[in-house]
Structures are given as structure tokens and as C-alpha cells.
């Protein structure tokens, strides 16, 4: 059965985590914001939206089943990936009329156990203004594979992406948030139409002491 998403990249996802708080309870990080972002991606990809309450309740019901998989180690977490893909048995170029929404989880440790060397990418582009950068589209990740491999061949572990127009302004890092300490203040890249960071939106105005 040939699925439309296999040929058109009609797939998008979110990446979330569940942790245990000091009381041992399982908690989610900004689930309604993630639901909103999921729907923003859906609209951009011509896919159906999901009611935010339904999205969040689905996660809660799944965590009731998978709660024993949430690590107790405070540096570990349960990775959660909600995603949707087209299911029409059609190979033409058009939005699908049917989709499947799924969520899978797996326990994970710290992504990196030590500081890593990173490369500032000034040749290749992950996402451009007006494109699908703010949508968690599968094609965004495919665009990063080749430059990431080149960086790894040079001994780097990750990329820091710059703007597509001038390669002058830092936008984001590949698998993490990027921030700097400048004049005693914590500085993060501006939120743009290529990426939105909820960690950025969560950070208060911070002064490094």
C-alpha cells in the first residue's frame, strides 16, 4: 500500500519530554503550547488540526500507561513524540484526505555527557523565511543531514545554524537550545518564522551573577 507521505514528506512531529518532579509525580513541559505548535505545523502542511484539550488528554492517558518508564534520575526523562502522517494510497501532488496521528515514548538519558565542539554553519541552510522552518516538517530534518555529516567529518558534534539570507545571524542549534552570556545577561536568538523555542519563551529576564 503506497502511502502519500512516502513521496511528499507529508509528515510532521513534535518533540516533548516528561519528567518526575521532587514529589515523584510525572509532569509535562508546557503541553498546551506544544499542542498549539503542533496545530501551527498542521496548518502549514495542509493537515488537520487537533483540539488542544484532546491532544493534551491523549498525552496524559498515554502517560498513565507508560508512567513506569519515566526515569527517576532527575537528569533523565521520557521522550515523547506525537506525529501525524498522510495515509492516502495516492502518489500525486496534493494534500491527503486521510491522516494518522500517533504518539510514541521511550526513556532517555542526558543527550550529551560532556561539552561538545560545534560548528557555525555559514554555507548550508536548514530553513528559510517563508518556508516550513517553524513547522516541524520531516523535510526540515532531511535538509540538515548532509551539512551535519560534513561537520561530523570535520570533528564537530553539532551545528549552529545561521540565517538563510546572509548567514550572519545565529538562529538555532541542531539538537539543543543556544544561548550566550553577554555583558552579564543571558541572551538567546530572536524568535523568527523559521523556529520557535518554548525554552526561550520560558526563560525570565536573567542576569548571570
Which residue ranges define each predicted feature?
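Conserved alpha/beta cores of soluble small-molecule-handling proteins
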Residues: 6, 10-158, 165-169
Amino acid at each position: 500500500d503506497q502511502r502519500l507521505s512516502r513521496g511528499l514528506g507529508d509528515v510532521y512531529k513534535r518533540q516533548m519530554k516528561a519528567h518526575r518532579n521532587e514529589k515523584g509525580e510525572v509532569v509535562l513541559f508546557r503541553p498546551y503550547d506544544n499542542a498549539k505548535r503542533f496545530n501551527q505545523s498542521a496548518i502549514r502542511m495542509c493537515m488537520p488540526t487537533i483540539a488542544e484539550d484532546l491532544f493534551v488528554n491523549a498525552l496524559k492517558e498515554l502517560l498513565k500507561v507508560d508512567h513506569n518508564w519515566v526515569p527517576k534520575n532527575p537528569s533523565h526523562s521520557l521522550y515523547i513524540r506525537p506525529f501525524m502522517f498522510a495515509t492516502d494510497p495516492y502518489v500525486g501532488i496534493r494534500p491527503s484526505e486521510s491522516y494518522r496521528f500517533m504518539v510514541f515514548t521511550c526513556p532517555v538519558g542526558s543527550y550529551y555527557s560532556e561539552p561538545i565542539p560545534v560548528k557555525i554553519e555559514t554555507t548550508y541552510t536548514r530553513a528559510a523565511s517563508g518556508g516550513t522552518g517553524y513547522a516541524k516538517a520531516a523535510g526540515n530534518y532531511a535538509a540538515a543531514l548532509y551539512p551535519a555529516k560534513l561537520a561530523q567529518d570535520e570533528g564537530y558534534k553539532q551545528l549552529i545554524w545561521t540565517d538563510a539570507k546572509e548567514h550572519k545571524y545565529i538562529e538555532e542549534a541542531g539538537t539543543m537550545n543556544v544561548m550566550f552570556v553577554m555583558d552579564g545577561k543571558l541572551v538567546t536568538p530572536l524568535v523568527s518564522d523559521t523556529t520557535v523555542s518554548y525554552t526561550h519563551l520560558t526563560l525570565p529576564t536573567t542576569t548571570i551573577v
